[in-house]
Amino acid sequence: MTSKISCFDRAVFRRALKKTAPVWILYTLYELLLPLRLFSFCRGVSSCTDDFLVQIEKTILGYARINASLLPFLLGGLLAWVLFFWLFRAGTAYFYAALPVRRETLFLTNYLTGLLLCAAPALLSSLLLWAVGAGFGAAVFVPAMQVFTATMLGFLLFFSFAVLVCCVVGQMAAMPIVYVILNFTFFVLETIVRHLLFTFVYGMPYSQSSTMQSFALHATPVLGLLQGGFRVQTDWLERDGMYYMEYAPRLEGWSYLGMLA
């Protein structure tokens, strides 16, 4: 039998959908909860406030922070673990190798399936966020698409890394452990070294900020994105000389997120 030249196989795709059904169903439910949360927020905030529309936009952008860090860290690792389980058992690997499907096709089909399972619910959620915001008079198409973009960049980072770990480790129980360890290696090592210096070097403050500490934080994507690397920033406007009002909310840290992805 001749091998297929295509980079995508429908039979492998359907099998991957069935294997990962619990994962992408839970993920889809989470994404659908975001528009409901926004709707609840909009109903709870008075539309008479001066910054009502700004608060809607800021709330939508706030979803991008988790969607670009903690969510893809968990989802990417879990999807890679399920999609590439055939690498973990010799019998399963031999079975797939005997199929009339090129190895490139097998790998790319599973990889593209993972990207699709993240992109489809994320895009649906972003469109619903746009619809909810528009229902309350806010033009939030751009912020909603920014949430989608941030989600995909974060997922591309963690899913690709998890796939690499699967290919290198090739052991079912060890893969999640190695995945977590490698994601937090720099931060843990820097913390240990700082603690040792604090213990044995006289006058060394434990909380001293250093270049190495900042590097370790940015080299740990989950923590780096959560702790200021990717954040919502707003400007403040003076009104009537008495108080300040937020305006022009935006996401900062796109270069850091793009560099990681």
PLM segments and residue spans:
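Aromatic- and glycine-rich beta-strand/loop motifs that create alpha-glucan
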Residues: 1-28
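Start (N-cap) of specific transmembrane helices in multi-pass transporter permeases
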Residues: 15, 19, 105, 109-118, ...
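Hydrophobic alpha-helical transmembrane segments of multi-pass membrane transport/permease proteins
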Residues: 18-46, 67-78, 181-189
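Terminal transmembrane helical anchor/hairpin motif
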Residues: 41-62, 185-261
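Secretory targeting signals
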Residues: 57-68, 113-179, 184-203
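Long, hydrophobic alpha-helical segments
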Residues: 63-92, 103, 111, 118
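Hydrophobic cores of alpha-helical transmembrane segments in multi-pass inner/ER membrane proteins
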Residues: 75-78, 154-160, 257-260
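Short helix-to-coil transition segments within interhelical loops
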Residues: 97-104
